[in-house]
């Protein structure tokens, strides 16, 4: 399965803290998990066409991430929004997806991502 993990490029500390744990997770070995920061000159719009799922780290407001979420919606991808406890997320997201997860620890986030992927397998 191909999974795109979208996140803010600026002030991306919530996902940066979890990044290495997700990369070391068994899920990353079983599926193609892509973070935009791993790629140079990356065309996320084109890449999303070939994805099975989008996980959006929405703790930090980001116009670019909002655009990517819009593309994922246009392509009919399931979208799962995750955010750090205490973050104020955009109300507009509820019109895009009903899948939200608030996490306190990196371990909670990785466990949630593993659960989502295991339950959505193609």
Name each model feature, range by range.
Residues 1-122:
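Conserved catalytic or regulatory cores that recognize and/or transform ribose-phosphate-containing ligands
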